[in-house]
Amino acid sequence: FFKQKTAYEISLGLVGSEMCIRDRMKTVTKSLKKFKHIPIILDPVMISKSGDYLLKSDSINFFVKNILPGSFLVTPNLHEASIITKMKKIKTKKDIEECFNKFTKLGASNVLIKGGHSEDKNKSIDYLSFNNKIYTISGKRYATSNTHGTGCTLSAAISGNIALGMNLLDATKNAKQFINMAIKNSFNIGKGYGPLNHFT
């Protein structure tokens, strides 16, 4: 693919079981080493919105040691950040700073901790560690259950913005605004967690 097309960024999401990771990601990682100039956006999908684990502990360890290092941006939610860094809680500013330090030691260049699962009922606050600074990016929290796929959509929007030439901070702010509108104008379809409106 890279011999025929020009890639401006690479996005990685749910990678499945450890066997799947070993079989497929070794091939991907080997290819990526030839294109280190291309930023990798890594969304470590480990826990579903309902709280179910999507990766087993051995798969998570393999993921952290072999996939996370070298990525340009990692976008965990609060639960995933807690699992990866082995922190019991991430609530205070001090917790956020400690969490970012742990991610740095694991090999992550930049990290966006998504606060959609926080206890704040009025705002959804994300924290971005970029160029050795911590930025707070907040958005209004809407009273809706139509939030299925918010994390995946956010990382995809950031990836698209980076491909368009935005720096990481602007790309993240723009993506956050897009997510807010997609949730605000979401669809009421079926039961449970409904879909966003990606065409907002």
Residue map of PLM features:
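Short beta-strands and strand-loop turn motifs
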Residues: 17, 41-48, 75-84, 137
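Short, small-residue-biased leader/transition segments that mark boundaries at the very start
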Residues: 4-21
